[in-house]
Amino acid sequence: MTMAVLKRLARAGVVLASAAVLASCQLATHPITTNGYGPSDGIRVVVADGINVENLLVVTEAEGETGYVIGSIVNNTGTDATVLLDIGESGSPSPFEVPARGNINLTESDMTVESVDAAPGATIPTTIQGPDGFNEVRATPVLDGTLPEYAEFLETATAP
């Protein structure tokens, strides 16, 4: 073989080796599209396998005012479940009995926070308790009526 042919073979070998190395990166990388997430303004919390708190947030007009809780608790299991939410620093958790393969719309439950300890745009602590000893504190967003969907909610909630 001539020197030119050997150089071409060496270059081809480098290209093939580089392609193999780059392709192997995909094997070690977890595709982000397989991660569950809540495409919303609120938070999503996996309480247990099949039990989630979805889109949890508090809407208020201002710090110190009443806050209205938005979100839902979803139970995709075959058994009823109890989930407790303590939003803010109230110290009195609200229990929710979520039926098997059912959900609870927190907006319809008329859950409120008497006096929100944070301004819109900040977060307040929420303690979430559930089956199997689940007990976590999460930062829950506080929003105001800037977005039309929340302005409508505040108008409805404060109407006489």
Language-model regions, residue ranges each:
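C-terminal motif of bacterial Sec signal peptides marking the signal peptidase cleavage site
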Residues: 20-24
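Bacterial signal peptide processing site
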Residues: 26-29
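Extracytoplasmic/periplasmic copper-protein system
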Residues: 32-46, 142-160
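N-terminal edge beta-strand
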Residues: 46-60
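Asparagine-centered strand-capping/turn motif at beta-strand->loop junctions
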Residues: 71-77
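Short acidic, flexible loop segments centered on an aromatic residue
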Residues: 78-92
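Intrinsically disordered, low-complexity Pro/Gly/Ser/Thr-rich segments with frequent PxxP/GP/PP motifs
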Residues: 88-116
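Extracytosolic low-complexity repeat regions of secreted or lipid-anchored proteins
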Residues: 105-148
